[in-house]
Amino acid sequence: MIAYKLVRRGRDGNLYPLFIDRNRPYVFGEHRIAEYIPTKGFAPRLGFHCCFTPYAPHLKQNLKSGEKRVWIECDIDDFKTYPRPPSQGGEWILAQKLTAMRVISQDEVKKLNNDI
């Protein structure tokens, strides 16, 4: 199933998770299996956090620190949904298997979000 994930674009140009296992880059085409990585300050929710659409209003895309975030399209499998309030984008996906496929442009993000 296609899903969307917000990631950090590192200074080296690689794409990294926002919070958990944040130093391991995503590689397009690489199949990843979720691992439990305890991280202080975060609830223990095993799985790659993804969205049905590229919409997460509680997460900024351009931070004051200069960090840039972009949406990637992913192929996911073995997932469950996790209910969240509309202010956090509604339902989240917790996927056990993820393959990062490509960065989606801001124009694509707008179109995908207008289509819902």
Where are these regions (language model features)?
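Mixed-charge (acidic/basic) macromolecular-recognition segments
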Residues: 95, 106-116
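ADP-ribose/NAD+-binding catalytic cleft of ART/PARP-like enzymes
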Residues: 1-45, 61-68, 80
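Intrinsically disordered, low-complexity, compositionally biased regions/tails
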Residues: 17, 33, 51, 93-94
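Generic "edge-of-domain/loop-turn" microfeature
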Residues: 11, 55, 79-81, 103-108
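Charge-dense polyanion-binding interfaces
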Residues: 63-104
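Catalytic toxin/effector domains delivered as secreted proteins or via bacterial secretion systems
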Residues: 42-50, 54-57
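Generic preference for hydrophobic/aromatic residues in regular secondary structure cores
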Residues: 4, 48, 100-103
